């Protein structure tokens, strides 16, 4: 990868993890053919798995962790480090005879520098256990529109103080998102046609978190899928990475 290309990779990873405000750390593992990213929040509300479109040379045969992500995010957003003439590179050190990534070094054109330390592999592996997911059949998939996002955000603003979840259900060949329950304040929002899928169980997911994920990219690069066993999957493609968010239902 070109010099400073790591900056774009780190920005993209943080955008799709740290910006959601629910993940404490992220694990990055690489080989010569792939670079994988994964994490899960403390409550296991969202399981995150990502793969970079192109393998990242700095992480080949290595595993590192990102914690204190607000520090890394702050460095990446500093105008001096974000300029084309700044240098951003991964520094490696020898450990047990093997060169491993230990930090990211930032230097601007005036000589101002900053350093961000990675979590070592054994530390992140101990704190963020391997996330196993064998996959699942998905019964209904849609590409959310901008109108969907606006409608969901609007009614979330109206009802979130009283109801923080939503329930997707199909009715007469259409998919609706229900917020609130019978006997209280509620709304039913038309999302899309669903001629080939059927979701009738009243599974619930946190609307605020789902909205944050859906806002990560333009609607054309997002696919939302649901299965009848209570799994919501959102796939986001950024051009730099392909990211999958898995949300087990709450009820």
Predicted regions: what is each one?
Residues 133-137:
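Alpha-helical phosphate/pyrophosphate-handling elements in metalloenzyme active cores
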Residues 1-116, 138-251:
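DNA polymerase processivity clamps
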